[in-house]
UniProtKB/Swiss-Prot annotation:
<dbReference type="GO" id="GO:0005524">
    <property type="term" value="F:ATP binding"/>
</dbReference>
<dbReference type="InterPro" id="IPR018181">
    <property type="entry name" value="Heat_shock_70_CS"/>
</dbReference>
<keyword id="KW-0067">ATP-binding</keyword>
<comment type="similarity">
    <text>Belongs to the heat shock protein 70 family.</text>
</comment>
<keyword id="KW-0346">Stress response</keyword>
<feature type="region of interest" description="Disordered">
    <location>
        <begin position="592"/>
        <end position="615"/>
    </location>
</feature>
<dbReference type="InterPro" id="IPR043129">
    <property type="entry name" value="ATPase_NBD"/>
</dbReference>
<dbReference type="GO" id="GO:0140662">
    <property type="term" value="F:ATP-dependent protein folding chaperone"/>
</dbReference>
<dbReference type="InterPro" id="IPR029047">
    <property type="entry name" value="HSP70_peptide-bd_sf"/>
</dbReference>
<dbReference type="InterPro" id="IPR013126">
    <property type="entry name" value="Hsp_70_fam"/>
</dbReference>
<keyword id="KW-0597">Phosphoprotein</keyword>
<protein>
    <recommendedName>
        <fullName>Chaperone protein DnaK</fullName>
    </recommendedName>
</protein>
<dbReference type="GO" id="GO:0051082">
    <property type="term" value="F:unfolded protein binding"/>
</dbReference>
<dbReference type="Pfam" id="PF00012">
    <property type="entry name" value="HSP70"/>
</dbReference>
<dbReference type="InterPro" id="IPR012725">
    <property type="entry name" value="Chaperone_DnaK"/>
</dbReference>
<comment type="function">
    <text>Acts as a chaperone.</text>
</comment>
<keyword id="KW-0143">Chaperone</keyword>
């Protein structure tokens, strides 16, 4: 049976895991790393993903895309702050969604995410020796409907059957609690690169029940990096009058240096940020260098506003679960940003206990997703996962009010129906406006979509009975139906936010991805053929130097070597490269045979002598 994998598609890094013998195992990528940077770069007609993409970011800031998770499933008007912080171009799409522009070509966040997924899956397939087609993909618990749908679409574009979209903290709890025997109430504190989630669960006898979840999709480790970036840029501007953030290459260097400093300050009390030749003096045109000492105390001062924002979701999750900090048995830290000592201190202050460090914060989410994949594939038994919807869902009613049908923290899957009526006499159609959020007025909440129910018989206001049903599936994705009871007329909508892709767009992107995959495969094959010919040439040259063969064979081999050199330099087509490699290997073989024959002619060439030990 084909394997299904678990994928943590992260803001800064991504991880893929699989079940081996009932235990989740993280799979290394082609570079031998367990964690793959969530970075995609477009350079000279080729697409780089992961470490290779991250490495060349400073030289190619406009063509290197990172933190794409901050843009997925969002409207352009919602991401103005995030768009200013990245060196690449973020532009509005025709649907009001987000697009990334590289050299005049527009990419959706789903396409970029699919490239990361494809890299993870292709590398894992090679590692396992079998093609992977099924996956469970994780998302922040606080992702809304549009963001979940967009993530599922990214999986489809990558050629995957997405078995389930599950919440990151829930996945982490699965990995933590799989072998636990007793009952525990745990709080998962998940601070990743770009999102923050707090989830309270009860774990016992294979049942993982989410009691409450809260969070902030605009808060993570990269916000800490940007706090350092802003400080460095301000200090440099004060000193030299140059705005480094206006230069895309300088901004990329600042971002990388800030991330490095943040990581170092988790284990040391101070670090030096050194960026030589960061800019030119506007007056003298001489190079300017940035050299700045950053202490842990200063770093904690810079991120103080972010640390304060961690408190609200923790308190909200506890309140919604009806628990006090003393009733929490374990606090599980998830996400790389939880390594920051000041973050751990906030956890201690809020919950009055030392956090549990038994899980790897970078890998535990993917491992939990692999367990859920095993559950769905029937490999893991006696595990039941009961998750919740993170935000309330409802419809707009008279006066612009949001009427809630499904309150936040309702266990999913779930179905809820309510009866509504018309506001005007002889109204023959109603518009159902579906909303997600916690504010009382419709305009203050997230609009998920609108649809019309037509053909209502003319009746006085308040007489028609319109049944509106909300259905949330196990992925947390919403389906809404409206039915007029007297006629049985029905209308429905699978909520696709205007920022998510239509089926036609998804199919177009899938086809494009397949074409690119074919191009990539051809490019790789071509490179391998060139390398094979070049390696054969090097081997042939060594044989010429080390062995003495017949003059005619030598001339043939030298000619084949010369031809190989010329074809590699000319970047010849594949058939020529293949033929030249075969020709060269044959010439080497013939030359070596001749050389062996010459060296082993028998008695005339061999001097017989007794063996005498040296004195």
């Amino acid at each position: 049976m084909a394997k299904a994998v678990g994928i943590d598609l992260g803001t800064t890094n991504s991880v893929i895991a699989v079940l081996e013998g009932g235990k989740p195992v993280v799979l290394e990528n082609a570079e031998g790393e367990r964690v793959t940077p969530s970075v995609v770069a477009f350079r000279d007609g080729e697409t780089l993903v992961g470490r290779m993409a991250k490495r060349q970011a400073v030289l190619n800031p406009e063509g290197t895309i990172f933190e794409i998770k901050r843009f997925i499933g969002r409207r352009f008007e919602e991401v103005q702050e995030e768009a200013k912080r990245v060196p690449y171009k973020v532009v509005p799409g025709p649907d009001g969604g987000v697009r990334v522009e590289v050299k005049g070509k527009l990419y959706t966040p789903e396409e970029i995410s699919a490239m990361i997924l494809r890299k993870l899956v292709e590398d894992a397939s090679k590692k396992l020796g079998e093609k992977i087609t099924k996956a469970v993909i994780t998302v922040p618990a606080y992702f809304n409907n549009a963001q979940r749908e967009a993530t599922a679409n990214a999986g489809r574009i990558a050629g995957l059957e997405v078995l389930r979209i599950i919440n990151e903290p829930t996945a982490a709890a699965l990995a933590y609690g799989l072998d636990k025997k007793g009952n525990e109430t745990v709080l998962v504190f998940d601070l990743g690169g770009g999102t923050f989630d707090v989830t309270v669960l009860e774990i016992g006898e294979g049942v993982f029940e989410v009691k409450a979840t809260s969070g902030d999709t605009h808060l993570g480790g990269s916000d800490m990096d940007h706090a350092i970036v802003n400080w460095l840029a301000e200090e440099f501007k004060k000193e030299h009058g140059v705005d480094l953030k206006a230069d895309r290459q300088a901004l990329q260097r600042l971002i990388e240096a800030a991330e490095k400093a943040k990581i170092e300050l988790s284990s040391t009390l101070e670090t030096t940020i050194s960026l030589p030749f960061i800019a030119l003096d506007p007056a003298s045109k001489t190079p300017l260098h940035l050299e700045k000492k950053l202490t842990r105390a200063k770093f904690e001062e810079l991120i103080q506003p972010l640390l304060k924002r961690l408190r609200g979701p923790v308190e909200q999750a506890l309140k919604d679960a009806g628990l006090t900090p003393a009733q929490i048995d374990e606090v599980i830290l998830v996400g790389g940003a939880t390594r920051v000592p000041a973050v751990q201190q906030v956890v201690r202050e809020l919950l009055g206990k030392e956090p549990n460090r038994s899980v790897n914060p970078d890998e535990v989410v993917a491992m939990g997703a692999a367990i859920q994949a095993g559950v769905l594939m029937g490999e893991v038994r006696d595990v039941v996962l009961l998750d919740v919807t993170p935000l309330s869902l409802g419809v707009e009613t008279k006066g612009g009010v949001m009427t809630v049908l499904i309150p936040r923290n309702t266990t999913i899957p779930t179905r809820k129906c309510e009866i509504f009526t018309t506001a005007e006499h002889n109204q023959t159609a109603v518009e159902i406006h579906v909303l997600q959020g916690e504010r009382p007025m419709a305009q203050d909440n997230k609009s998920l979509g609108r649809f019309r129910l037509e053909g209502i018989p003319p009746m006085p206001a308040g007489v028609p009975q319109i049944e509106v049903c909300f259905d949330i599936d196990a992925n947390g994705i919403l389906h809404v139906t409206a039915k007029e009871r007297s006629t049985g007329r029905e209308a429905s909508i699978t909520i696709q936010n205007t920022t998510t892709l239509s089926e036609e767009e998804i199919q177009r992107i899938i086809e494009e991805a397949k074409r690119h995959a074919e191009e990539d495969r051809r490019r790789r094959e071509h490179a391998e053929l060139k390398n094979a010919l070049d390696s054969a040439r090097v081997q042939a040259e060594r044989v010429l130097q080390e062995r003495q063969g017949a003059p005619e064979a030598r001339a043939r081999l030298e000619a084949a070597i010369g031809k190989a050199k010329e074809l590699v330099e000319r970047d010849a087509p594949d058939p020529e490269l293949k033929a030249a490699t075969e020709e060269l290997l044959k010439a080497v073989e013939e030359y070596e045979k001749g050389a062996q024959a010459a060296s082993g002619k028998g008695p005339d060439d061999v001097i017989d002598a007794d063996y005498k030990p040296a004195d």
